[in-house]
Regions:
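Active-site-proximal alpha-helical scaffold in enzymes
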Residues: 1-11, 50, 158-178
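Residues that mark the start of a beta-strand
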Residues: 10-12, 97, 181-182
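Short beta-strand segments
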Residues: 13-19, 183-188
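Active-site-adjacent elements of ketosynthase-type condensing enzymes
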Residues: 21-33, 165-169
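Flexible loop/turn segments at secondary-structure boundaries
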Residues: 22-23, 108-111, 191-195
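Condensing-enzyme catalytic core mediating Claisen C-C bond formation in acyl metabolism
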Residues: 30-103, 109-112, 128-137, 142-151, ...
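C-terminal transmembrane helix-loop-helix hairpin of multi-pass membrane proteins
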Residues: 114-117, 121, 128, 153-162
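Hydrophobic alpha/beta core scaffold segments
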Residues: 166-172, 178-186, 190-196
Length: 217
């Protein structure tokens, strides 16, 4: 969407997605099996409007894009490397230059009883571990990293719904208020693709404070 706007092909693009009843049923089945009430009883959805630069609103930096190619493999370290550390390194940035990361933002109150653990926390631990390996972070700061650069998951766990984008409204407000400068949104993982091919898919991008001088979506 940002590329379409930045190219001038379109002035405004709406990115819209809805939840999935099949995933809702899968989670509910796991909860009932453990004698719990069905904790996820709603369909998620979101819509994001991407439009031309107004010189004020946060922008998407199209120079910092992470991609997960087939050759990357499915190992967690390889996935996070291709989506997080690689694009940052290409642009002369460290992991610690990003104020917040928004990976798979599933609500742990829902995923833990279903046996999937705390998904956002697992992602933050991997990002922090890679940052230590790259020399961007001290090992003693690993625990602090997840608090300072992460969010607690709050989104419904339906496929693409929690994958990065739930933070966008909150992040926009925080950047406008001067509380944040750069945030990386990470969309990754596909349950069904993974089960069929043992592969992942994914993309990441950075939302940042308006640069003013540059034309950006």
């Amino acid at each position: 969407a940002a590329a379409l706007v930045a190219s001038g092909a379109y002035k405004t693009v709406a990115v819209t997605a809805g939840g999935c009843t099949a995933k809702l049923g899968m989670n509910g089945k796991d909860h009932v099996k453990k004698g719990l009430p069905i904790l996820e009883d709603m369909l998620g959805g979101f819509s994001v409007i991407v439009t031309q630069d107004d010189g004020v609103s946060p922008e998407i930096n199209l120079d910092i894009l992470g991609r997960h190619s087939v050759g990357t493999g499915s190992a967690p370290q390889a996935v996070i490397g291709s989506l997080v550390t690689d694009p940052l390194e290409r642009n002369g940035l460290k992991v610690t230059d990003i104020d917040k990361f928004s990976p798979e933002m599933q609500n742990p109150d829902i995923t833990k009883p279903a046996g999937a653990g705390d998904v956002p926390l697992a992602n933050y631990k991997m990002i922090a571990a890679l940052a230590v390996k790259k020399g961007d972070l001290q090992k003693a700061d690993l625990a602090k990293f997840t608090v300072e650069h992460g969010f607690t998951g709050w989104a419904p766990t339906q496929g693409h719904i929690p994958s990065g984008v739930p933070c966008i409204g909150h992040v926009r407000n925080a950047i406008m208020d001067g509380k944040m400068k750069r945030v990386m949104v990470i969309g990754k993982g596909s349950l069904f693709l993974g089960r069929m091919t043992n592969l992942f898919d994914g993309v990441s991008f950075v939302i940042q404070a308006n640069s003013g001088a540059e034309k950006a979506a």
